[in-house]
């Protein structure tokens, strides 16, 4: 019988840092919730609590609307680091 993998417990980094508000202009903080193709990563992968996940989603959508974060990334750009310019 195969052994079960032991995973480390995921924690919400925003709760631990006692963040009250997530600003859409802070792209350095928002990039941790984005995949390499700038898609919003789900809670089960990031470990973010429901309250902060909703705040992150709203902030990312606002940043996209103001053109601080792109909506999509070309395949060619994924080979390079898309977060290099942030």
Curated annotation (Swiss-Prot):
InterPro entries: Ribosomal_bS18, Ribosomal_bS18_sf
Gene3D superfamilies for this protein: Ribosomal protein S18
One GO process term, biological-process aspect: translation
GO annotation, cellular component aspect: cytosolic small ribosomal subunit
Any one GO MF annotation of this record: small ribosomal subunit rRNA binding
Keyword Flavoprotein: no
Keywords: Ribonucleoprotein, Ribosomal protein, RNA-binding, rRNA-binding
Family: Belongs to the bacterial ribosomal protein bS18 family.
Subunit record text: Part of the 30S ribosomal subunit. Forms a tight heterodimer with protein bS6.
Known role: Binds as a heterodimer with protein bS6 to the central domain of the 16S rRNA, where it helps stabilize the platform of the 30S subunit.
Name of the protein in question: Small ribosomal subunit protein bS18
């Amino acid at each position: 019988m195969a052994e079960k993998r032991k995973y480390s417990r995921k924690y919400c980094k925003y709760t631990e840092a006692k963040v009250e508000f997530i600003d859409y202009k802070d792209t350095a903080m928002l990039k941790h919730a984005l995949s390499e193709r700038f898609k919003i990563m789900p809670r089960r992968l990031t470990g973010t609590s429901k309250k902060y996940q909703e705040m992150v989603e709203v902030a990312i959508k606002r940043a996209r609307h103001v053109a601080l974060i792109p909506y999509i990334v070309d395949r060619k750009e994924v080979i390079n680091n898309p977060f290099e310019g942030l």
